[in-house]
Amino acid sequence: MAAFATAEACDSNAELISNGDLRALHPIFKIYGQRRCFSGPIVTLKVFEDNVLVRNQLETKGEGGVLVIDGGGSMRCALVGGNLGQLAQNNGWSGIVVNGCVRDVDEINDCDVGVRALGSNPLKSTKKGHGEKNVPVHIGGTLIRDGEWLYADSDGILISKTELSV
């Protein structure tokens, strides 16, 4: 991906911001992974302290997409760890945004993928397979729909109804 500046995107797309087609997530996410800047079409998951669907999704070809995981904001366990970070890298995912925690931070930071999460927790999640895929999720003060576009850099995270020109 070419360098994409979220601040510039906001400055040059005032109309999209005013009509709600371009939205910024609240600045609550910590930055992990080697990609500080990433973007792609969104695939959504809604899970709670269970990462079976996360693994299942990351086992598919990412084709430059971004997996957005609504983990309910739980800080009690991690939904993504080093193995899943490596899986995301190997399968061509551009990034992962977790409304929840990660673990194996050093391993994730070695992966060529962008990861944003609320924090880290060494506890693993349950493995029951509960959750939903391709559903609207509400994260960081923003409604996010499957198929929208996500743009992330060191300044923040934007959600766009359509792909923006870089």
Curated annotation (Swiss-Prot):
Residues annotated with N-acetylalanine modification: A2
Cofactor annotation remark: Divalent metal cation.
EC number: 4.1.3.17, 4.1.1.112
Annotated keywords: Acetylation, Lyase, Metal-binding
Family of this protein: Belongs to the class II aldolase/RraA-like family.
Subunit relationships: Homotrimer.
Protein name per Swiss-Prot or TrEMBL: Putative 4-hydroxy-4-methyl-2-oxoglutarate aldolase 3
Lineage: Eukaryota, Viridiplantae, Streptophyta, Embryophyta, Tracheophyta
